[in-house]
């Protein structure tokens, strides 16, 4: 599983350590001793259910600091906002980097290039909640969503991908483009209308990975080189079933490992027992 560049991906975390959150956090730490990940991609909903009120909110301790306390998890964490963060103070999530040295969130959407042993990997982090109408139009529940400039983010995404020359490009955001779910279909159609054409435009995106649905899904659409991945919850999973394009799905909770070398990109879905239950392989 270890590559030139190795990353963790975890999302839909915040259960105050309950359910499987703490055991999975311990597993991530133990596996980290062998894999030596560069960082954790924290793809939204770090805090259920109403986000955080401030950088001093006790949820930072009960959902994050005291749970992900293994020495091997004292890494850079690169987060994105999920819909549950948008129920609270989203600026506090960005500002938490002034409190915790491992919280690396320079903006609501941003990009990071990893360069190691001659391999380059670009991760593009999206803020997907403001790209979806049902959040934009519900300011009572998601007060910060309507304040964001959708066009500016989409233009930034287009420009970022247009200029991306790395060996591999992965785009992550909280919401899926394709997935089995009983959540509103409009979430996916908005993502398909607004984000998908940009992802496909420059033919350099290998994987779009998300959370939100609380199960593992790997979807591949005919005529599309991008692999669409739903990463499960790292605390509490939900049932799943196959849909059009499903390569694999599982209702296990857990996390994922991304491994990159010059010619190969792999993503491993890990259950709470530490078993690899599915592997996505990309080659050049």
Which stretches of residues belong to each language-model region?
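N-terminal active-site segment of His-dependent metallophosphoesterases
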Residues: 1-58, 180
């Amino acid at each position: 599983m270890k590559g030139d560049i190795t990353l963790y991906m975890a999302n839909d975390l915040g259960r105050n350590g309950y359910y499987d959150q703490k055991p999975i956090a311990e597993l991530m730490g133990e596996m980290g001793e062998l894999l030596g990940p560069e960082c954790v991609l924290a793809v939204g909903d770090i805090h259920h259910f109403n986000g955080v009120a401030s950088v001093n909110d006790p949820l930072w301790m009960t959902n994050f600091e005291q749970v992900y306390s293994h020495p091997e998890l004292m890494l850079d964490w690169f987060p994105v906002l999920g819909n549950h963060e948008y129920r609270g103070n989203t600026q506090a999530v960005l500002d938490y980097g002034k409190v915790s040295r491992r919280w690396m969130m320079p903006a609501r959407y941003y990009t990071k290039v990893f360069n190691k042993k001659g391999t380059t990997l670009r991760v593009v982090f999206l803020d997907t909640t403001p790209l979806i109408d049902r959040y934009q139009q519900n300011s009572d529940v998601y007060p910060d969503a309507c304040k964001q400039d959708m066009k500016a983010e989409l233009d930034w995404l287009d420009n970022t991908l247009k200029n991306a020359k790395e060996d591999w490009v992965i785009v992550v955001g909280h919401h899926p483009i394709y997935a089995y779910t009983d959540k509103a279909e409009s979430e996916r159609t908005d993502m398909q209308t607004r984000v998908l054409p940009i992802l496909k435009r420059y033919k350099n995106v290998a994987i779009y990975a998300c959370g939100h649905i609380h199960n593992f899904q790997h979807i591949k659409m005919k005529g599309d080189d991008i692999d669409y991945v739903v990463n499960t919850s790292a605390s509490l999973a939900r049932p799943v079933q196959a849909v059009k394009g499903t390569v694999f799905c599982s209702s296990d909770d857990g996390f994922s490992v991304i491994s990159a070398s010059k010619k190969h990109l792999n993503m491993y879905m890990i259950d709470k027992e530490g078993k690899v239950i599915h592997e996505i392989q990309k080659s050049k």
